[in-house]
From Swiss-Prot:
It is found in: Nucleus. The modification Phosphoserine is found at residue 77. Residues 167-171 are annotated as: Mediates the transcription activity and dimerization of the AHR:ARNT complex. CDD domains: bHLH-PAS_ARNT, PAS. This is Aryl hydrocarbon receptor nuclear translocator.
Amino acid sequence: MAATTANPEMTSDVPSLGPTIASGNPGPGIQGGGAVVQRAIKRRSGLDFDDEGEVNSKFLRCDDEQMCNDKERFARSDDEQSSADKERLARENHSEIERRRRNKMTAYITELSDMVPTCSALARKPDKLTILRMAVSHMKSLRGTGNTSTDGSYKPSFLTDQELKHLILEAADGFLFIVSCETGRVVYVSDSVTPVLNQPQSEWFGSTLYDQVHPDDVDKLREQLSTSENALTGRILDLKTGTVKKEGQQSSMRMCMGSRRSFICRMRCGTSSVDPVSMNRLSFLRNRCRNGLGSVKEGEPHFVVVHCTGYIKAWPPAGVSLPDDDPEAGQGSKFCLVAIGRLQVTSSPNCTDMSNICQPTEFISRHNIEGIFTFVDHRCVATVGYQPQELLGKNIVEFCHPEDQQLLRDSFQQVVKLKGQVLSVMFRFRAKNREWLWMRTSSFTFQNPYSDEMSIFICTNTNVKNSSQEPRPTLSNTIQRSQLGPTTNLSLEMGTGVLASRQQQQQQQQQQQQQQQQTELDMVPGRDGLASYSHSQVSVQPVATAGSEHSKPLEKSEGLFVQDRDPRFSEIYPNISADQSKGLSSSTVPATQQLFSQGSSFPPNPRPAENFRNSGLTPPVTIVQPSSSAGQILAQISRHSNLTQGSAPTWTSSTRPGFSAQLPTQATAKTRSSQFGVNNFQTSSSFSAMSLPGAPTASPSTAAYPTLPNRGSNFPPETGQTTGQFQTRTAEGVGVWPQWQGQQPHHRSSSNEQHVQPTSAQPSSQPEVFQEMLSMLGDQSNTYNNEEFPDLTMFPPFSE
């Protein structure tokens, strides 16, 4: 009832079965409502075509339906099983294919790894990515950067093959050689093997490289040339990186193209003659390379250490065929080593080999502002013999020659002015064995960059050998050697013994000249004797100047010894008195005329009497000529003088006209250094009488200027001479400078003194003395008053 209620459609569709099912007589195949529905639905199609009875057809349909379901189930399971098998087989096939592909890739990458030297040389097997990266790098290195041509010509277009070869070999200081890897036969060697190994090319051609190396190095050389398997090969040391490569023989690496070789061996050195030009440095390297090889024994071959670097290349090259008579022809493609051999400089040179070359000749020192050693290089022991501690704390001037001490001081002063520039000076240095060594010192100053103050002197002291044959180095422009005078330069260039002998000769000549002058002066009664006055009585010694720079003519206002004269002059010649150190000048020498020729002597020609224009016996004072305006003023002064006076007047300090405007000049002169005796006219020692134009000059010693203490007594004032002889010269003495006050008998105190009174405030073009005053130093007996000089106000003031 429930089934009928649940399936109303079924009951209405099948009315014949409805009551049976409803009455509780279900069929054997009916177990529930759901199954009945399904079977009823499936049976509907069968009922439409069944002509038999309803009951029999019902049981038959149930059996047929069950059998069909079983068949479908079994067929479905067979299909599923076959598809699973197919999938499994497909997966197996794919895995096998992938396995084979991976195996092939691994094999190819392994082969590529063996072909790349950088990969095969690694201690561990690299991964595939590393192998590919190294292979690409290796191919790039073989092919180059791309800037070179593909045919292998890597030389510039403007260089030939020979020029390129010579440039490479010259830069490498070695020789190029090519040897066969199989036999070791020398295929090629460059001609530079001669200066390197003293062997001609003929000794290498036709021989093997094994014949040229040391017997103990043959095995190592054979190992470097080998390209086959060798079970005895041990670890490989990379000389470039210093790392130990993996053990075993890498045949692929050793046979591959571009494999690098670098090894050190001992090669035989010949005895053939070599061009000295090419041996100058290589022979020195050969001597150094013998270190550690022991001394060369008589009769044994001479070996040197050679460093060979190169690459393994295919032989013969591509496109090159060997001749038929070549012993290696027909053997197929072989390999050869193309390398450059260079002399290996050892790290520990032998002292005996380098004793003659490394002998130090200079040392470096540092000094403070006073010149005291603050640092000394250890090479001073071999240069001057002193230990560094013996020089520290001492002044360098203490070790300098007395004649060169001032020169060294001046050089230090000039270095301070140069502010960092180098100045060289040469002086004599006292070594520890008490010998004088010529030392060239190149010094410069180190200044504090913040305060700009000089801190220390840094000097490089070089021992100059055979200094007597070498010219003195020219000092820089900062030291004006012309101001030092020829005497100082002459003394610095002469040895001590030569200088002493020269002074002795000059002293003897001084005594002879003094005796001759004293005898002739005693014989001169008056003015007439001056007509026979010869220049031979006061001959001047020729002075050989030290350099060409001293031969230039002196300017009009330039004295040979000026006020700021170098003080070393008095140190070298202490015998020169104060008056003899005065400044000298000549008014009769033009600006373009040379004072005297180098090394020339003055001929003893007698002087004409008209050269002596002075009214007294005192020779005229040679004075620098001023401008023409000053001469005209003095000429006007002389015209107002008394023309009837027969002799030169003698002035007293009370009646002498004083020029107050010239007092600053006197004050300036008094402040000068007493070392050179400027304005010191009281002493009787003076230069000998010379009034010849161009004659006055400086002498290297005191011989040319003898001391005559008794000359004043031989020249009494000539008061009886007539006025006709010297009418225009009698009153010109009124212009005497106020510096000469107190020197009334002036002609008795000095004769022929040649003065230069330089004033620092007055320019050099305006000297202080004039040409018209040549003869104003006569007998100054008469007195004058100021009324006799109405034009005195025209005299230009010198207050400035």
